[in-house]
Amino acid sequence: MSAPTVPGAGIGLDDLPLRANLRGKKPYGAPQLTVPVQLNTNENPHPPSKALVDDVAESIRAVAAELHRYPDRDAVALRADLAAYLTRQTGIAVDTANVWAANGSNEILQQLLQAFGGPGRRALGFVPSYSMHPIISEGIDTEWVEARRNADFSLDIDHAVATIAERRPDVVFVTSPNNPTGHSIPGADLARILDAAPGIVVVDEAYAEFSAQPSAIGLIDRYPAKLVVSRTMSKAFAFAGGRLGYLVAAPAVIDALLLVRLPYHLSVVTQAAARAALRHADETLASVAELAAQRDRVAAELAASGFRVVPSDANFLLFGRFADAPRAWQRYLDHGVLIRDVGIPGHLRATIGLAAENDEFLRVSRLLAADELINDESDESTGTP
């Protein structure tokens, strides 16, 4: 018996009328592997509590009888819950009208670029930073412009302001804490970027709950026509599988997104599950302090083993300097530890996990330190993200 055929398998991308600016590109692809220690995608390693699982299950059961109807198109109840959470977490009063939600923060970023980017428009980011910013920009036919960070991955605010003045981007991305380096931007520096920017400034606060830096939300009243703060429930909130991202901005920004969002984009199941997760916010976020303490412990032990560790305000560490980062990544994997090669020469990124996971990561790191690290202190190359 012949093997089953796959209809249409005889063609490839080159045979399709793909847009020219997408040819040769690669999709986002963090490895998803089953290994003993998974420290590569910056999730909260603590699973949801039984109380949260039960609440999610009951909440979904309650709405299941209405699955034949479309969900609340504007997710008003969920947005109200998010506004209440933000008001408590940041100490800044936030109203339902300031909040918008979508399927993960990547959909939030996509909607923002649909509204404020597009053909003939330009987006700028300070690299190395979150790899989805250029991918989403180019996917919406927005010109992507890179501005470099310092050799130590910090942001040179004078250079940043000068680059914005020169390139005049329609959208500026500022990630704080920055992924994959971990730096947070001080409020005074962010204000300088907002003053210089001619268009929208998106402050990506995916890891904000881990940071000691005040949220950029406090600047919205001062820059209502420019500032958008993007957040997610995938990191500190331990809700990565639930796929819920949101933003905070002036109500007019939400009105703009209503022009480009798909109707009924948030399912009734997603809305119910996210609201249940928000009811358990205090319990879930109690792990943040513990993860921050683990981060500091891991950073200190890596440094003691001879690694250079970039100071981090998030739940991950960028560290090196490896003679061959892809080879070192594979050796970690061979030992059952999955971390992330983010494409920065000489460096790898590790998520902070549970204490036992961190112990195993550190054990393997000590093994690799003997023959994988560069000893030449003069090479400060940062490469590209």
Swiss-Prot record:
PROSITE patterns in alphabetical order: AA_TRANSFER_CLASS_2
Gene Ontology molecular function: any one: histidinol-phosphate transaminase activity
Domain of life (superkingdom): Bacteria
InterPro entries xrefs: Aminotrans_II_pyridoxalP_BS, Aminotransferase_I/II_large, HisP_aminotrans, PyrdxlP-dep_Trfase, PyrdxlP-dep_Trfase_major, PyrdxlP-dep_Trfase_small
Modified-residue entries (N6-(pyridoxal phosphate)lysine), positions: K235
Keywords, sorted A to Z: Amino-acid biosynthesis, Aminotransferase, Histidine biosynthesis, Pyridoxal phosphate, Transferase
Protein name as it appears in the record: Histidinol-phosphate aminotransferase
Organism of derivation: Nocardia farcinica (strain IFM 10152)
